[in-house]
């Protein structure tokens, strides 16, 4: 079995689960108790990164290690786009997965990390099929929608998953000849065989999770019904008044996403949820609510 197949197999093990952002071992324990399939260890959740206006880098490895020691579920950590040395450090730390994340300040505005150079599986964000396939070609073992992290507004995540699905369907219908496939692969900057495999299967060849703006059980179920295979929850849980109850509810909603009776049950009496900010209030050039993080990446 190829090393890439091993890495994609590890990512497949998370399918149907919820991955939660945590900033302390105590939060990681809450996430594990609530049924999270993995946690993302970071020093600040995306909502706080967005407000800070500062350069956001890889978290302190000591903090990540403390979280790794606190739980038995897999632990992920983020690196800046293109910062392969941060990735080398996290691989040496033996994190379970690395997220090359647009939420952090990019280290390289031209290149993403060549992920085939690492044994640890990588997660990457994408807002359309071209981005997803470019990241997979670089070695990403899991794709997630970019959404708009730190907002509590799920609309961008919805837009990204529906766009990827629509592009796959459109290309399946419209690409007929070898020259059609070659032209589209050139346009997307990906190998023809990768494009053909994706269209033949009718979906990405790696697991595709939802991320960015998920704040309620209904948000999680919506994205699962739209075709996502699991959910990342960032700022939403620990910006709420009852994090453990909300975390349990989102896990239940992700599992029972097509059961309205169960969704009604888990959506009730959750306390105050994350207030959030709407996508429309974010100035793409920056401002009090920060930049459009989903536009970062190429």
Curated annotation (Swiss-Prot):
Listed InterPro entries: Aldolase_TIM, PdxS/SNZ, PdxS/SNZ_N, RibuloseP-bd_barrel
Catalytic site: 78
GO molecular function: amine-lyase activity; pyridoxal 5'-phosphate synthase (glutamine hydrolysing) activity
Residues annotated as transmembrane: none
Induction of synthesis: By the absence of external thiamine.
PROSITE patterns given in the database record: PDXS_SNZ_1 (PS01235), PDXS_SNZ_2 (PS51129)
Residues where D-ribose 5-phosphate binds: 21, 150, 213, 234-235
One annotated GO biological process: thiamine biosynthetic process
Catalytically driven reaction(s): aldehydo-D-ribose 5-phosphate + D-glyceraldehyde 3-phosphate + L-glutamine = pyridoxal 5'-phosphate + L-glutamate + phosphate + 3 H2O + H(+)
Known EC number: 4.3.3.6
Keywords: Lyase, Pyridoxal phosphate, Schiff base
Associated pathway: Cofactor biosynthesis; pyridoxal 5'-phosphate biosynthesis
Cysteines paired by S-S bonds: none
Taxonomy, superkingdom: Eukaryota
Pfam family of the protein (one): SOR_SNZ
Family under the similarity heading: Belongs to the PdxS/SNZ family.
Subunit architecture: Homohexamer. Interacts with THI11.
NCBIfam families in alphabetical order: PRK04180.1, pyridoxal 5'-phosphate synthase lyase subunit PdxS
Function: Catalyzes the formation of pyridoxal 5'-phosphate from ribose 5-phosphate (RBP), glyceraldehyde 3-phosphate (G3P) and ammonia. The ammonia is provided by a SNO isoform. Can also use ribulose 5-phosphate and dihydroxyacetone phosphate as substrates, resulting from enzyme-catalyzed isomerization of RBP and G3P, respectively.
Name this protein carries in UniProt: Probable pyridoxal 5'-phosphate synthase subunit SNZ3
Top-level taxonomy: Eukaryota, Fungi, Dikarya, Ascomycota, Saccharomycotina
């Amino acid at each position: 079995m190829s090393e890439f197949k091993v890495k994609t197999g590890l990512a497949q093990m998370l399918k149907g689960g919820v991955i939660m952002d945590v900033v302390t071992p105590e939060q990681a324990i809450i996430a594990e108790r609530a049924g999270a399939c993995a946690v993302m260890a970071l020093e600040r959740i995306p909502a706080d990164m967005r407000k800070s206006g500062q350069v956001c880098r890889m978290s302190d490895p000591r903090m990540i290690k403390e979280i790794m020691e606190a739980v038995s579920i897999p632990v992920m950590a983020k690196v800046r786009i293109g910062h392969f040395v941060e990735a080398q450090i996290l691989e040496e730390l033996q994190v379970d997965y690395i997220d090359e994340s647009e939420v952090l300040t990019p280290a390289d505005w031209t290149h993403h990390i060549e992920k085939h150079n690492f044994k640890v599986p990588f997660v990457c964000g994408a807002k359309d099929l071209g981005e997803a396939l470019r990241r997979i070609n670089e070695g990403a073992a899991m794709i997630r929608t970019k959404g708009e992290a730190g907002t509590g507004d799920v609309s961008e995540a919805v837009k990204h998953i529906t766009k990827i699905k629509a592009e796959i369907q459109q290309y399946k219908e419209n690409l007929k000849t070898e020259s059609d496939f070659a032209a589209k692969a050139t346009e997307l900057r990906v190998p023809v065989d990768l494009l053909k495999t994706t269209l033949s299967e009718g979906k990405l060849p790696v697991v595709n999770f939802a991320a960015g703006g998920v704040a309620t059980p209904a948000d999680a179920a919506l994205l699962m019904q739209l075709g996502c295979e699991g959910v990342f929850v960032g700022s939403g849980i620990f910006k709420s008044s009852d994090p453990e109850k909300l975390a349990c509810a989102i896990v239940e909603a992700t599992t029972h996403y097509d059961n309205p009776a169960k969704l009604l049950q888990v959506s009730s009496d959750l306390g105050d949820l994350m207030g959030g900010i709407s996508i429309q209030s974010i100035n793409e050039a920056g401002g009090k609510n920060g930049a459009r993080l989903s536009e970062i990446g190429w």
